[in-house]
Structure formats: structure tokens, C-alpha cells
Amino acid sequence: MRHGLLALICWLCCVVAHSEMLNVEQSGLFRAWFVRIAQEQLRQGPSPRWYQQDCAGLVRFAANETLKVHDSKWLKSNGLSSQYLPPEMTLTPEQRQLAQNWNQGNGKTGPYVTAINLIQYNSQFIGQDINQALPGDMIFFDQGDAQHLMVWMGRYVIYHTGSATKTDNGMRAVSLQQLMTWKDTRWIPNDSNPNFIGIYRLNFLAR
């Protein structure tokens, strides 16, 4: 009886988790909005509503803003016009809360998650070939005592350095060619670099 109840609970959890995932169409629109919002942090500078500005914070912020309703109030607060935007997504209330309920480990969820936990508990490993990356995927590096994420934008990466000054907001954009020829080889995304762990994709995306 107890085993049957446990199996039922596990099945229900899987059904709930699956129902909250984005389907293929939603995932494509999520990527388009995610990339656009991330680009705006580069073009305009980090939004004043983006707290905890670092590499993982960029992913959390862009994901959370992507899942919101992009009405005129939202557009105004983000300095965007209604032109040249992706189509709006139709999402359930549960799906809109996905970026407010990151798996933090130890059975906890919440709006904050570290870079390592974003990868370990909220993403799936895709591979170490950059050609496998889709826009919005994450490129993950582990230096042992520190981890770093870059966001693949399609032809280049963007990231936040984790620090900012009055003259430097911390945002960076680097072409793939620049990235693959960096003098600091710790940040080159190929399988000969032991610090490059791989390309990761958010768990709730269908592809």
C-alpha cells in the first residue's frame, strides 16, 4: 500500500512538472524574448530592477522578465517600443512563475539560485560542441572556487562580469571568434579546456 502511494505521488509530481514545461512553440518564443531582454541589458545597461548583477543574475533576470506579460506598462518600464518584438507567449499561471521557483537544492525553491545550482538543478547538459547551442543556452565554466556563465546569443555570447563601477556596468559581448582565440585559455569553450564544463539548457524548455 505504501509503495503504491509513493508511486502515485511520484507520478503526480512528474505530471505537474511536465505540465509546467514549455512546449516547442512556447520554448521558441521564450528564446526570442530571453535573447531580446538580455540584449537590452547590453544596449541600455542593466535594468534598475535587475538585482544581484552577476552572470547567473543575468539568466535569472532575463528568464523572469521573459515569462511576464509584455504589456504597455512592461514595455515602458523596460525602455522598449512595441516594434520588432517577438510574438507574445500564452502561458499558464504556473509557467509564468517558473523563474520565481528555481530549484535551490535540498528540497528548496525560490527566486534566487547560484550559478552552480542553476546548472546542477535547473538545466540539462547538451554537450561541449558550441554548434549544439541554441540562443539562450548557457556556456558554463568551473574554475574550482568560482563558476561562470555566458549566454549564447546565436553568433556571440554576452555575460556580466560580476562587478560594476561608475564607468563600467559589467556587461560584455564577445564574438565566437574572439572567444575561441582568447589569450586567457580558461574561458575558451572547447573540450581541451578542463575549465569548460559544457553547454546547458534550462530544464523547462522543450528543446
From Swiss-Prot:
It holds the Pfam family DUF1175. InterPro entries: DUF1175. Residues 1-19 form the signal peptide. It comes from the Bacteria. Keywords: Signal. To P.aeruginosa PA4490 and T.maritima TM0986. This is Uncharacterized protein YfaT. It comes from Escherichia coli (strain K12). The gene is yfaT.
